[in-house]
Regions:
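C-terminal helical cap and adjacent loop that interface with cofactors, partners, or active-site loops
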Residues: 175-250
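Structural motif
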Residues: 7, 36-38, 65
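Active-site-lining helix/loop region of Rossmann-like oxidoreductase modules
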Residues: 54-188, 202, 208
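Alpha-helical support elements that line or immediately flank enzyme active sites
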Residues: 43-55
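Rossmann-fold NAD(P)-binding glycine/threonine-rich loop
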Residues: 3, 8-34
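Gly/Ser/Thr-rich loops at beta-strand to alpha-helix junctions
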Residues: 11-17, 40-45, 69
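Conserved active-site and cofactor/substrate-binding residues in soluble primary-metabolism enzymes
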Residues: 19, 23, 43-44, 98-106, ...
Length: 250
């Protein structure tokens, strides 16, 4: 009977497999409880993309990009878990990020479902940037020729072409090739009529709390999730989540 709002990389639960998904749904039905996953990415950025789509008469493609120099995120385990530090040519590297971040695929599936798209497949692609010299980040070392940046893309495809793309571009420092430019935030682009571009980023990149930015979309969703029907719910099934009761009127 306990409603759950989580930022633990959970959107639809499909990554857990059919058997575990059925267990969750059955438990939710018995307890009349709901479970919802949110955060920034996956999370609020996909809601922004869906809301932006309402301004279009025709949509050819929606792209969501997270692009950042993540050197300040001092978690060697996280980076090593998605392939950083391995040789660029390591045949096992491409599958690491896909296995470690299944909720990004779930987010694409959620958007496709919300837009009523008959998706044929969700494709995963990745490319790497190699360190141009030995790099010591303080919390991990990356040897020359090893992975120091990656670009991933999960794309929902209809009639053989990508109609929704979720892209990630992460790098650790600037001693890498290719040295991709980054946006230091999130960018939503819609190709269509009209074509749109939305940028969501901290005004002062070095002075914000990423944990707070991740938590608040979940906190603001609590009331809506408690009122939702039992089971796994996604953003398109809830009312618009806003920052109610947060405006400083003093």
């Amino acid at each position: 009977g306990c409603n759950i709002v989580s930022t633990a990389y959970f959107i639809t639960g499909s990554m857990l497999g059919a058997e575990n998904l059925a267990r969750i749904e059955a438990a939710a039905a018995r307890g009349n409880a709901s479970i919802y996953g949110s955060g920034v990415n996956p999370g609020i950025i996909h809601i922004i993309a869906l809301v932006a789509s309402s301004g279009c008469a025709r949509i050819d493609k929606i792209s969501v990009l997270e692009s950042v120099d993540a050197t300040a995120y001092a978690s060697a385990g996280t980076w090593e878990g998605i392939g950083f530090g391995r040789r660029v040519e390591d045949p096992e590297a491409p599958a690491l990020a896909e296995r470690a971040m299944p909720s990004f695929k779930e987010a694409v599936a959620m958007m496709a479902s919300a837009l009523r798209l008959p998706v044929e497949e969700i494709r995963y692609d990745v490319e790497y940037a190699a360190a141009t010299e030995d790099v010591d980040l303080g919390y991990m070392r990356i040897g020359k020729g090893c992975i120091s940046g990656l670009r991933c893309c999960w794309s929902a495809r209809v009639n053989g072409r990508a109609v929704i793309e979720l892209k990630i571009a992460w790098k650790l420092g600037d001693k890498l090739a290719p040295n991709w430019p980054v946006e230091d935030g999130w960018v939503v682009e819609i190709d269509g009529d009209p074509s749109l571009r939305c940028v969501y980023q901290p005004r002062h990149m070095g002075q914000f709390d990423p944990g707070l930015m991740t938590a608040m979309p979940a906190v603001h969703a609590i009331a809506a999730v408690c009122a939702a029907p039992a089971g796994i719910v996604t953003a398109d099934q809830l009312p618009l989540i806003i920052g109610a009761h947060t405006v400083n009127i003093a």
